[in-house]
Amino acid sequence: MEAEETMECLQEFPEHHKMILDRLNEQREQDRFTDITLIVDGHHFKAHKAVLAACSKFFYKFFQEFTQEPLVEIEGVSKMAFRHLIEFTYTAKLMIQGEEEANDVWKAAEFLQMLEAIKALEVRNKENSAPLEENTTGKNEAKKRKIAETSNVITESLPSAESEPVEIEVEIAEGTIEVEDEGVETLEEVASAKQSVKYIQSTGSSDDSALALLADITSKYRQGDRKGQIKEDGCPSDPTSKQEHMKSHSTESFKCEICNKRYLRESAWKQHLNCYHLEEGGVSKKQRTGKKIHVCQYCEKQFDHFGHFKEHLRKHTGEKPFECPNCHERFARNSTLKCHLTACQTGVGAKKGRKKLYECQVCNSVFNSWDQFKDHLVIHTGDKPNHCTLCDLWFMQGNELRRHLSDAHNISERLVTEEVLSVETRVQTEPVTSMTIIEQVGKVHVLPLLQVQVDSAQVTVEQVHPDLLQGSQVHDSHMSELPEQVQVSYLEVGRIQTEEGTEVHVEELHVERVNQMPVEVQTELLEADLDHATPEIMNQEERESSQADAAEAAREDHEDAEDLETKPTVDSEAEKAENEDRTAMPVLE
C-alpha cells in the first residue's frame, strides 16, 4: 500500500497580489474586461464590479441589488475625489494635495464606505499634526487616537450598505498602566512607527500600518486574550465587586443634536463635535476652508458645492435646462443628456418609407419604434419624464402614469380604434399652428376654419406615416419632411340666397395638404356605440362623382328657381288678354 502523500506548503509569494492589482489597473486603463461605467459630474469612469465591491461596502450592496446595470450615475461626489479613490482602489496609493482636496476625498470615501481609504487619510492627518512628545515618565493628560469613523455616510441617490459605526479609541487615563506581557508593543513604539510613515500607501493588510497595530493592541487588551492586564485607578479588581462597579458607570448614550449620531462615551461624543460640528470659533473642521454652505429651501439639505446644489434643486422644481438637438428631449443634468446623445438617432438621411431601427448603445437592444426606444432609455438614465399635473408626481414609464391616473384620479384613457370621430372646432383669435391626428383614423368630421358658415364638412386623413404618430400628437417638425404623405379633403356645404329670396343648396369639394392648412381641432369621443359604425372611405372616384352630383344639383335647383320665377308672369299676361277680349265683345240684349 502506497504511503499517503502529504501536502506541503511551498514558498509564499507576497508580491503576487500586487502583480494581480497592477494587471487589473492596466486592464482598466485600456478599457478591457470592464463591466461598469460610473458617471460622476459628467465624466465616465470604467471599472470592474468585482474590484469595486471588494473595496467598497457601498458598491458591494449596490451590485447585489442591481446586477445588470452597465451604467451608474453617482451624485454627491466630486469628479476629483472619485478619481483619487479609483486610483487608490487599483494602485493602493493615495496622492492628494491641500486640506480642501483631502476633505473632498474624505467625504467621498465616507459616501462610498471605503474603510481603507479612510484609514489612509487618518494617517495623513496624524502626520500633518504636531509630532507626539516622547516621555518615558508618562503624562496625566488623556490622549486619544481615533482610527476611523464611518457612520456619517450620506446616501442620497443610491442605497448604501447597512453597517454599524466602526470606532476604535485608545485612552490613557490618569494613573498607571501595568503590562505583564513582554511581547506586546508599547505606545512609544507605535508612535515612532507612525512618525516613520512618509508616504500614504496601503499594501492590503491592516496590520502593516501603525494605527492598525495600535488598534490591534487595544482590541487584545479589551478582549483579554493576552496576559496583559490594564488596571484603572479607582476601579476594583475583585470579580465579585466588578458587577456592582459597572452599575456605577452611566449607560446613557450621548446623541449629537446635529446629525443624530449616538455615542456610548462622552469623550467620543465630544470628539465628534470638535471634528465635525463645533469648534472654539463655532466652525467645524469641514467648514474651515471658508466654503459657502448652500441650504435647500424645500428639504433643508446642505451642499458645499454650488453645482450639486443646483442639480438638487431641479428635483423639486422639475427644471430641465438641457435639450437634445435631435429629438428635443429635455433633461435635468448635462451628464444624462450626454448619455442620451450616445443612443439618440433621428433617422435623418434615411429613405422615405423605410422603417427606422433604433439601437441602444448601452445594451445593444434594437427597437423599431421611437416611443419604445425612448421608454427603454430611462432604464439607463434613471429619468422620469412622465408627469402627473394633478398631484405633481413623476413616473418612469407611461403605463405607470396611466395606472396612477386610473387608480388615484379615476381617469381612464380610452384607446381609439374606431375610424369615425366627431369633433368641433375651437374658435380662437390667435393663429392655429397644429393639428391633432389620431392613429388608425380614416375620416374625421369637423367644421372648417376660416370659411363661410356652413352646416357640416368632411375631413379625410390619408397615408399617415407611422413615425408621425407619437402619443396621438403630430409634431410640426415632421410635417415638412413628408409633404406628399398627408392630405386633407373636406366637403363644404352652403346655402346661397337669390335676389327673390330663394335659397339654393351648393356643395364644393376641397382637397388640401395638412402642412398648408393649419387646423386645430378638439376631439370628443362619440357617446354612442361606435362598434357598429361603418367607416366611410372616400377615394378619388367618389370625390369626382360627389363633385359632379353637387354641380348637377346646383344646376337643377337654379333651373327650378327660374321656372318658379317665369310662371307667374305668363299667367298674368293670359288673364289680361282674356279680359280685353271680354271688353271688346258686344253686349246682346
From Swiss-Prot:
Chain ranges of the BTB domain: 34-98
Any one Gene Ontology molecular-function term assigned to this protein's record: DNA-binding transcription factor activity, RNA polymerase II-specific
CDD domains: BTB_POZ_ZBTB35_ZNF131
Cross-link type Glycyl lysine isopeptide (Lys-Gly) (interchain with G-Cter in SUMO), residue numbers: 567
Cross-link (Glycyl lysine isopeptide (Lys-Gly) (interchain with G-Cter in SUMO2)): 255, 261
Pfam families associated with the record: BTB (PF00651), zf-met (PF12874)
Region (Disordered): 224-247, 539-589
Record-linked Gene3D superfamilies: Classic Zinc Finger, Potassium Channel Kv1.1, Chain A
Keyword set, alphabetical order: DNA-binding, Isopeptide bond, Metal-binding, Nucleus, Repeat, Repressor, Transcription, Transcription regulation, Ubl conjugation, Zinc, Zinc-finger
Motif (Nuclear localization signal 1): 137-148
Subcellular location: Nucleus
Biased segments, Basic and acidic residues type: 224-234, 539-583
Motif (Nuclear localization signal 2): 283-294
Ranges in coiled-coil conformation: none
PTM note: Monosumoylated at Lys-567 by CBX4 and UHRF2. Sumoylation may potentiate ZNF131 inhibition of estrogen signaling. Sumoylation does not interfere with ubiquitination. Ubiquitinated.
A GO cellular-component term linked to this record: nucleus
Mapped zinc finger ranges (C2H2-type): 254-277, 294-316, 322-347, 358-380, 386-409
Stated role: May be involved in transcriptional regulation as a repressor of ESR1/ER-alpha signaling. Plays a role during development and organogenesis as well as in the function of the adult central nervous system.
Family stated for the protein in its record: Belongs to the krueppel C2H2-type zinc-finger protein family.
Protein name: Zinc finger protein 131
Record gene name: ZNF131
